[in-house]
Design a protein with these regions (language model features):
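Flavin (primarily FAD) cofactor-binding/catalytic cores of flavoenzymes
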Residues: 2-94, 152-278, 282-535
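Short, solvent-exposed coil/turn linker segments
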Residues: 83, 91, 105, 110-114, ...
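Conserved N-terminal glycine-rich FAD pyrophosphate-binding loop of Rossmann-like flavoproteins
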Residues: 92-128, 309-329
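Flavin (FAD/FMN) cofactor-binding and adjacent substrate-gating region
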Residues: 110-152, 337-350
């Protein structure tokens, strides 16, 4: 079988000898799929792929994931002047904020509501000015947003942007930089070193878009931004769901569960909440809002495994507020991790010392918003909201069709049965990186290792340690790198800081321009006027 394919010029000297290795018309008898030899090869060659009948596409820089991390990286590169034919986004989603939009929606953040992000943390705007607050003030023709930012957090809660504002601005910037032109649809199977330098990224294209089952992207640089490895369930709830095949009464906050709220609108019921982070706060707000709006008789029992009763921390300069089980903090981490003393300190630490500092400043937390405090206080006073500390030893079906949680008190050791109609697991998205196929393959075949928190170990410029190959580099950003030299990786601003570090490293390697003061100023005016980036 003969496959036609076009070979693009690879810049930076990479692949200069390819004309002798791979002809313009590649002939082979392979099926176009991965062979046992390729599956087990830590280093691939053009001849191996040709033998398997897998076509090769040359693009110097590919980013894997297509979500917010990929978008921010592409934004930096386009602003730096990298043309569209030098970048490809390998993804199975339609637009960069698709996954984030889904997760915020199912975790009870509607369009008009506000997300947990700082005013100047704009993934669509690498300069952070104008801020979200200034944009919303202009849009609403009201200075109230600016006044709010001025008096936060002493006299008002932290100002945060509307969900709809974030997505609208992302759509604007995506169109401006020509993001859609860069997308190659499909599922990435693996990234392997290439003999001679660089990498092969094996993509399974969407059905009907390729003559072969697999396509290989030959690149000097690969950027991995795949987000969370998977959805994490509490073990006892996972066991219940699998044993009884009951996915109606025990649900995760990050999966569609609108039926819970609709059922409670039609009859009184009891809901058990598990978890103490921002998602638990959002789910509680939805339950409280519905109870008030529709005059419902919903009862809520909130079970905390770790129960915070007041201020806590190792010393006076590293303490956060807490009460009634909750640990309170405006954002995921103290703000100095994005540009202060904690950021500088973490960059110097290695191994256990770094891991110990993560433990000190990490942990589940949520903002202390006034509306939530009032709702919970009203619930406790009205005896329809109850918080408790305990360890759930097992979950079983209830006699009336609901579920029973057997809870062992952490204080007294006694056990009680709590009957409810639903259990909502709000414990988060974390999962081991080995559960993600691409990340697991990196650990097995490409030399990647784990950091003190068990995630991917990356350099300060986000190159994955142990994966360098010739003049090529393999980068990773976002949640899979938590535990590295920069703590705030899984945030809008964190993704921007990571993208800037990667872009600066690419400039040091001579692959793209560095965004200096003059170029930055010119490009900001282009952003402000929504001028498309040419090429």
């Amino acid at each position: 079988m003969t496959e036609e394919w076009s070979r693009k010029t690879v810049i930076g000297g990479f692949g200069a000898d390819l004309a002798e290795i791979v002809p313009d018309k590649m002939s082979g008898e392979g099926s176009g799929d991965l062979t046992p030899e390729l599956l087990e090869a830590p280093v691939m060659t053009e001849a191996m792929l040709a033998s398997a009948g897998i076509p090769i596409i040359d693009v110097p820089f590919v980013t894997i994931g297509g979500g917010m991390g990929s978008f921010v990286m592409v934004d930096y590169l386009r602003i730096a002047g990298v043309p569209t034919d030098q970048i490809r986004v390998l993804t199975n989603i339609d637009f960069p904020w698709q996954t984030y939009e889904y997760l915020t929606r199912v975790s009870q953040i509607p369009d008009h509501s506000r997300i947990r992000s700082d005013s100047s943390s704009r993934p669509d705007n690498i300069w952070g000015f104008p801020s979200y607050a200034l944009s919303e003030a202009w849009q609403d023709k009201s200075p109230a947003h600016l006044w709010h930012v001025l008096i936060e957090p002493l006299f008002a809660d932290y100002w945060t942007p509307r969900r709809s504002t974030v997505f609208a601005s992302l759509g604007r910037e995506s169109k401006r930089i020509g993001y859609d032109k860069l997308i190659a649809r499909g599922a990435v199977r693996m990234v392997r070193r290439r003999s001679g330098g660089g990498y092969f990224t094996i993509l399974t294209p969407d059905a009907g878009t390729s003559a072969t089952k697999r396509v290989a992207y030959r690149s000097r640089f690969v950027h991995i931004a795949v987000g969370y490895p998977g959805l994490r369930y509490l073990p006892d709830l996972q066991e219940f769901r699998e044993k009884y095949q009951d996915y109606e009464h025990v649900v995760a906050a990050y999966e569609p569960h609108e039926h819970v709220y609709e059922t409670l609108k039609n009859r009184p019921g009891t809901v058990v909440i598990r978890g103490g982070g921002i998602v638990a706060s959002r789910v509680l707000q939805r339950l409280f809002d519905d109870r008030e709006k529709y005059q419902l008789q919903t009862n809520i029992i909130h079970i905390f495994r770790t129960y915070i009763e007041g201020k806590h921390g190792p010393h006076a300069w590293m303490r956060r507020k807490g009460s009634h089980g909750w640990a309170y903090q405006g954002f995921n981490y103290p703000k100095s991790v994005w540009g202060g003393q904690l950021k500088a300190r973490m960059r110097k630490l290695e191994g256990d010392a770094r891991g110990n500092l993560y433990k000190l400043m990490g942990g589940t937390n949520t903002p202390r918003r006034r509306v939530w405090q009032k709702q919970m206080a009203d619930g406790r006073a009205g005896d329809y909201y109850r918080d408790m500390q305990g360890e759930v030893t097992s979950v079983e079906p209830g006699a009336a069709g609901g579920v029973v949680s057997n809870v062992k008190s952490r204080k007294t050791g006694t056990e009680q049965r709590i009957e409810s109609d639903f259990i909502i697991d709000c414990t988060g998205l974390e999962a081991d990186i080995s559960e993600h196929r691409v990340l697991n393959d990196l650990l097995k075949y490409t030399g990647a290792g784990r950091n003190p928190l068990g995630r991917l170990e990356v350099e300060r410029h986000f190159e994955i340690k142990g994966t360098a190959n010739g003049d090529g580099a393999l980068y990773a950003v976002g949640a899979p790198t938590l535990g590295g030299y920069f703590p705030g990786v899984d945030t809008f601003l964190g993704l921007q800081i990571a993208a800037q570090e990667v872009a600066d490293d690419l400039a040091r390697r001579g692959w793209c321009r560095k965004i200096g003061p003059v170029r930055s100023t010119i490009q900001w005016f282009k952003w402000l006027t929504n001028t498309p980036i040419d090429r």
